[in-house]
Amino acid sequence: MNSSSAPNSYWNQKPVLSSGQKPSGIRDSRPKEDDYGVLDAKTFDAIEADELFDSVNHAITHAGQSVLYRSLARPETDAALIQKKQEAVRELASNSMLREALQHFVDTMKEGEQSLYHLLYGTFTGGIAVDNSRGGKDEMEFSGYGYHQFIDGTGFAIDMVETMEILPQPQSAYLRELFQAVRDFGKSRIYSLLRGPVYVSEGKFKTREEKPRYLPLSRFTPSMFKPIPVFFAVAALGAALYFFQGLLASFGIAYLGYGILVLAVPILPVVLIAIAASDRDTVIYPLRKLFKHSPELARLVDVLGMLDELLSFHRYSVAFGGKMTLPEISERERHALEVTEARNPVLARANSNYVPNDVSLDEAGRLLVITGPNSGGKTAYCKTVVQFQLLGQIGCYIPAAVGRLVLAEHIFYQVPDPGHLDEGMGRFGHELKRTREIFFNSTPRSLVVLDELSEGTTFEEKMELSEYVLAGFYKLGASTLLVTHNHELCERLQDKGIGRYLQGEFSPQGPTYRLIPGVSRVSHADRVAAALGFSKEDVEKHLASRS
């Protein structure tokens, strides 16, 4: 395939089509412990990326869901590519004819997608009975020799190439490139092998175009019924019957020839089974190994997933409810994120009463300190910020009125994690190690969230350490959010002219979940304890009842 005709930077991602013994899982692309891309494994878990995927996911194909999950787990940093994806999403929203045609295309391909996986990863156990891969089974073990799976699986690729030719032509560059990628696949050698016929020569496979015109070669027929072997077997039986009829007639026992014929008939299915087993082991299995390791076929499956992903974005924007927007993608040296009326993409789903907040991380306010009592919406706000960054960075809608962002090189989210302590290191050392890791990997185009800082030490040490760490992030230029109950720290930073400050708003009835300017100096810990049934009065009542 001519890779220049597709979004080149996207092909740097690992394909969703597995080259191994089993099909890939939808969530196989989640970051590992040693991954240092835009997201690391700890951040991925802390921001509830799996829940975000569940909220956004409206893809219908396995490839589409895998591509969407991969986009969230390993987001792009190429602003031009994301802008092209947004252009394609806008075209689908405005061009109903194209959207409906593409939706029908993806619906049709979904029916054949599983057939491809059955061919590539199925085990064919032999026997006369066959399991048709269009029967809806999830298992990867089939009786028969793989003929049905070969026909259905290769038919998926053939249908995709042929159907693409009759779709309305898009105007957006991203969609045009994906369409062209399918056409390029139709010109590849691997497509010729999938389409057939396939010729076998000394253990190697040749396409129709590669076969010498006047050289007779064995042609693979994906069927247990083989006309030529059957013809020769029947001819041999007929010749044998003719010979034995004449020979036995001379002894007056010509009737025995028919008995010999009856005994010889079962040889025919034995021969056919042997040929079918040979087809499976010498043609189907080797061919599918070639298919699984084909970058061209992997890209074709990726294209299906990428088209389904775009349609999923559109369906998500319609189903979520309320204001939705595609954020403007800016290219700057420093990270920035500005959103009006932001609603959390997980918590606000189908919740018309969710309280929106504005987000402003710019040059003047790249250090944002959020204070306030527990249950006031501080953590939800921070997760909204990071989840918006992630959705914008994959070309998806965000639940907001207006948005603008710069793609982040790195996104970090630190939360207290006392349950995973390193050997010989207490909570303070463990969390400080994580903060150090974040700091030394951050750049001016990074987004960092610190949910509490320097826990597990004395107040004086916490103040000193937090102050110089936050000043360091500020000088570094990364967009940094700190969640804290420490208003004394805020006062020190304010004295240095560093940071912008928000606090959770509370009414007499409780939290409003709106963040307003200022520094909170109240706790409301008694209110939270009372709501949980663990206030001072609850403790005293329990002790009184025990005595």
Predicted regions and their residues:
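Conserved amphipathic alpha-helical "coupling/scaffold" segments
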Residues: 1-228, 292-299, 303-306, 325-327, ...
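Juxtamembrane/interface segments at transmembrane-helix termini
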Residues: 2-7, 272-289, 313-319, 395
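Short, flexible segments with low predicted structural confidence
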Residues: 23-28, 38-40, 271-272, 278-279, ...
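Short N-terminal helix-initiation segments at or just after the protein's N-terminus
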Residues: 31-32, 275-280, 450
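Transmembrane alpha-helical hairpins and terminal membrane-anchor modules
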Residues: 215-285
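ATPase nucleotide-binding head domains, primarily ABC-like/P-loop NTPase cores
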Residues: 260-272, 310-547
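Short amphipathic alpha-helical segments with heptad-repeat character
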Residues: 273, 287, 291-294, 298-301, ...
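Transmembrane helical bundles of ABC transporter permease domains
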Residues: 284-322
